[in-house]
C-alpha cells in the first residue's frame, strides 16, 4: 500500500468527508489516519466547519426586495406566477446571492426573476432560478442581464465590477502549510488545533452565534463567486454536489476543488475563534 502524507490527506479531505473517494483511495487514507496524530484533528475541524455552515441561520429577506420585484414585473402576463415563485424560492435565492455578493444581493435576485420571466414560466423552478442567479452574479458588466433595483442607491454595481477586476487585490485564503522537503516532507508545519466547545452554537449563545457567523460571512466574501456559490449550495442549502455542479456549470473535479478551497478558508477563519485559549 503506498505511503500517504498529511498534505495528500488534506488535498482530498472534502472528498473523503463527502464519501466521494473510491474504495482504494479511502483505504489508503484510513491507513494513514490510524497512525497520524494531526490528520484526524484537521478532519474534525473540517467536519465542524461543514456543520457550522449547515446550521447557518436563514438570511432575512428585505421587504424592499419583494416590492422591487413586483414593480419590475408589473403589467407582465406572468407576474402572478413570478410572485408565486418568489414566495417559494426567494429566501433560497437571496441566501445564495448574499454568499456571493452581499452588497448586490437584491439586484441579483431581482434580475433573476426578470430573466426568468423572459424565458417563461417553465423557468420558475428552484433549479433553473438558481442557475440563472449564478450566471447573473458572474456577469462582469451589470448592464448585461442585470437590472439595478429602484431601491439601490449604494453604487454596489460599481463595487461588483471592481471586485471582478483581474488586477484588483484578492484576499489571501487560509490553507494548511506543509514541509516541502526532508524527512518531514508532506507533514503539517504546525499541528492543527483541537477545537473546544465553548464557542459552539447553543440556543442561549446569541452573541457567540453572531460572532461565529460574522466570521463565516466574512470568509465567504473572501472567496470567488463560484467558490462561494458552491459552498452555499452544498453546505448551506444542502444541495447535492451533482446538482450544484450542474447549476454552476462546473465539472465534478471543479466542484470538488471549489468546496475544498471554500471549506478550508472558512475553517481557517474559524480556527482562532474555536481554539481554546
Name what the model sees in each region.
Residues 7-9, 77, 88, 166-229, ...:
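Amphipathic alpha-helical segment used for protein-protein interaction
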Residues 138, 216-219, 227, 236, ...:
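DNA-recognition helix of helix-turn-helix
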Residues 1-34, 55:
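Short, amphipathic alpha-helical interaction patch
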Residues 13, 37-61, 68-73:
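Short alpha-helical interface segments
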Residues 2, 57-71, 149-151, 159, ...:
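C-terminal edge and immediately downstream basic/flexible tail or linker adjoining helix-turn-helix-like DNA-binding
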Residues 74-95, 102, 117, 123:
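A short, charge-rich alpha-helical start-of-domain segment used by transcription regulators
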Residues 62, 66, 70, 90-91, ...:
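Σ70-family region 2.3-2.4 aromatic/basic alpha-helix that recognizes the −10 promoter
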Residues 37-40, 47, 54, 90, ...:
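C-terminal flanking helix
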Amino acid at each position: 500500500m503506498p505511503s500517504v502524507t498529511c498534505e495528500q490527506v488534506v488535498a482530498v479531505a472534502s472528498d473523503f468527508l463527502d464519501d466521494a473517494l473510491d474504495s482504494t483511495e479511502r483505504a489508503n487514507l484510513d491507513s494513514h489516519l490510524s497512525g497520524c496524530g494531526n490528520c484526524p484533528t484537521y478532519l474534525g475541524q473540517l467536519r465542524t466547519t461543514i456543520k457550522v455552515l449547515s446550521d447557518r441561520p436563514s438570511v432575512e429577506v428585505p421587504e424592499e426586495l419583494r416590492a422591487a420585484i413586483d414593480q419590475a414585473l408589473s403589467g407582465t402576463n406572468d407576474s402572478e406566477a413570478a410572485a408565486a415563485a418568489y414566495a417559494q424560492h426567494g429566501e433560497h435565492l437571496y441566501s445564495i446571492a448574499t454568499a456571493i455578493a452581499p452588497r448586490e444581493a437584491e439586484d441579483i435576485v431581482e434580475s433573476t426573476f426578470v430573466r426568468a420571466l423572459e424565458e417563461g414560466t417553465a423557468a420558475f423552478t428552484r433549479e433553473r432560478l438558481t442557475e440563472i442567479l449564478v450566471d447573473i452574479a458572474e456577469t462582469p458588466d451589470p448592464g448585461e442581464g442585470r437590472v439595478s433595483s429602484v431601491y439601490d442607491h449604494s453604487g454596489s454595481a460599481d463595487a461588483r465590477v471592481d471586485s471582478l477586476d483581474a488586477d484588483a487585490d484578492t484576499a489571501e485564503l487560509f490553507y494548511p502549510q506543509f514541509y516541502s522537503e526532508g524527512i518531514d516532507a508532506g507533514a503539517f508545519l504546525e499541528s492543527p488545533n483541537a477545537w473546544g466547545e465553548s464557542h459552539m452554537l447553543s440556543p442561549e449563545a446569541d452573541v457567540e452565534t453572531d460572532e461565529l457567523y460574522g466570521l463565516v460571512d466574512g470568509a465567504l466574501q473572501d472567496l470567488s463567486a463560484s467558490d462561494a456559490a458552491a459552498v452555499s449550495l452544498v453546505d448551506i442549502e444542502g444541495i447535492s454536489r451533482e446538482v450544484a455542479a450542474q447549476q454552476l456549470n462546473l465539472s465534478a473535479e471543479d466542484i470538488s476543488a471549489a468546496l475544498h478551497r471554500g471549506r478550508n478558508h472558512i475553517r481557517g477563519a474559524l480556527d482562532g475563534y474555536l481554539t481554546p485559549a
